[in-house]
């Protein structure tokens, strides 16, 4: 566990919550230490780890991983675009095949579900495709902006 960091901006002091390193399968990332983790292997979407805020169950991170030897980010974008185009209209929106998130090249899109949305960032690290989904209620993306940026910035393949 990393200790809380104090960041000073002028006369204001902001306390950053403690973090921990989550390692799951071939992937590791930094998450808030007090958020709960759960493996989700059923229901819609890919098998994933869900990391949920203790303050609001609608605020969560989702992390998926897939081995993709030889895949490129443009290839990932084409594959995702085909899947999105085959889905019901309005569920997957704001597709960007060549975005930058937390300083990293990524494919991004937003998943819209009843009561919440998930902003997905898809990265390649070697032969592993990593997807980080940042879930919040509509209009409440600010509740996890820093947590999401930290997850995307820190996520990487291990082993």
Regions found by a protein language model. Name each.
Residues 1-5:
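Hydrophobic single-pass membrane-targeting/anchoring helices
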Residues 8-43:
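N-terminal "mature-domain start" segment
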Residues 9-13, 39-147, 153:
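Conserved polar/disulfide-associated segments of primarily extracytoplasmic proteins
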Residues 158-159:
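Short, solvent-exposed mixed-charge patches
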């Amino acid at each position: 566990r990393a200790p809380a960091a104090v960041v000073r901006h002028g006369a204001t002091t902001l306390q950053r919550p403690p973090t921990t390193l989550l390692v799951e399968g071939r992937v590791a990332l930094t998450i808030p230490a007090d958020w709960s983790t759960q493996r989700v292997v059923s229901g819609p979407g890919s098998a994933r780890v869900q990391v949920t805020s203790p303050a609001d169950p609608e605020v969560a991170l989702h992390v998926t991983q897939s081995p993709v030897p030889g895949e490129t980010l443009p290839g990932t974008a084409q594959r995702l675009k085909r899947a999105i185009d085959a889905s019901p209209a309005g569920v997957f929106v704001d597709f960007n095949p060549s975005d930058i998130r937390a300083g990293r090249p990524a494919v991004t899109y937003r998943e819209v579900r009843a009561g919440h949305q998930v902003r997905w960032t898809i990265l390649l690290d070697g032969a592993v495709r990593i997807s980080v989904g940042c879930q919040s209620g509509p209009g409440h993306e600010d509740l996890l902006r820093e947590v999401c940026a930290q997850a995307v910035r820190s996520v990487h393949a291990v082993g």
